[in-house]
């Protein structure tokens, strides 16, 4: 069996979309490859921050990486591509020390939807990305729509859609237009303050917004808890019965400012739950060109408008939309189609 060295974040130590996606991919690959793991851990409190502890961790990972590649013939390095100046330097260091000690291929996974925007951000970002692309063997994007124009058609680029494990077809429930669900970490860029601000202004029926997530810092936690009321519930991370809660919610709201191909939307689709989301990353492509409940990120008026559009939509039409979302998940994002594509990327032919 060939050997894969994985470097990245994994649950249960790290819980977010990327770590969960990593775990799914490693689970599949471990059936056909020997997997060597160097786990990366960045607490949510360090989100979007550079720190001495991060530098120390990178040096520790490089030390472990060098040890693995000198003792084992590694055929593939598999890692996530970070999108920041600091993150790009980390990518380049991992790539450099892997190539220095191994003849294997370096495969990096891009989980974000702003690759091209970062590339065009500055002269420095262009130089960092150009150097990295020159040295890397393969870049995995989440969708053809997220592959930057300047990389389309090159052999180094491919895509792999996300999937949900465990996969199950849930019963479609009547939509009462009452129960709203926010299920993401409490990060400002996830739009948590946007939905809280808008939801407290909505004057319609017996609405309830349940929010689940992990806090990233004390200041933001205080801002979020300010909105707690009889119809807005702020809760900790959801660890049990997640799919049942998604399935029983009337609508899931994801007001993110930036996304790639969010797992929470795939989870809602699998459960047949209506989605209200910002139109960022691959979300329009995931839900379909004519999906009605999308709004412009950071635009609170547009978010409010879409919520009222949902509330005024006929119940039968909502059931039809639930059926459509569930069918779309199983046609485009099933475990089986994901597995075939993943194994092909790593050169495994059954």
Predicted feature locations:
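A charged, aromatic-enriched C-terminal amphipathic alpha-helix characteristic of glycosyltransferases
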Residues: 315-347
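Aromatic "clamp/platform" in nucleotide-sugar-dependent glycosyltransferases that forms part
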Residues: 257
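Conserved acidic donor-binding segment of nucleotide-sugar-dependent glycosyltransferases
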Residues: 289, 293-300, 309-315
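Glycosyltransferase donor-sugar binding loop
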Residues: 39-43, 183, 208-221
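Short hydrophobic beta-strand element within catalytic cores of glycosyltransferases
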Residues: 274-277
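Donor nucleotide-sugar binding/catalytic pocket of nucleotide-sugar-dependent glycosyltransferases
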Residues: 128-169
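Conserved donor-binding/catalytic core segment of Leloir-type glycosyltransferases
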Residues: 5-7, 171-190, 195-201, 209-212
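Nucleotide-activated donor-binding/catalytic signature segment of Leloir-type glycosyltransferases, i.e.
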Residues: 221-238
